[in-house]
Amino acid sequence: HVIEVLDELGIRPVAISGASIGSIMGVAMASGMSGKEIRDYALNLAGNRTDVLRRMIQARSGSIRTLFSSENSFAQLDAVNILKTFLPEQMKGSFDELLIPTSISTTDYYGAKERVFESGDLLAAMAASASIPFVFQPIKYDDRYLVDGGIFNPVPYDHLHDKADIIIGVD
């Protein structure tokens, strides 16, 4: 909704920073998608349960049996595969392609500190930032295990202080 209001007001950010689902929304906006396009894509996808189930099975490593087995209660989903399967085609594939500079906040699980991406593997950064522990597998990156950026910094506006005069935070 916030992105749609910004669109209506003709406000285009000069920089974006996000954590967890906010990193995915931020990358969608930085890729040039409007708030309406993002909402329409999500509603269309959510409204088609058969397609969602098909995509979940497609994204799942292993068989359909392992997807629903009780022994799999702690086996987590692969966030990279989920994103590859569900992200709209309009979303860019690298930080260099983004129309707006973007920072993605993740949490270094064992280091108990924030890891911020502004370059490198965009898909891995989004996947790590949205990897809720025990739901999604941590993302191994540079020999570190990265999880949901919202754990350490849920609204990473502090990465925008030197990039923008006005900062809008959404929680």
Q: Where are the model-predicted features located?
A:
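Patatin-like phospholipase
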Residues: H1-A19, V27-D171
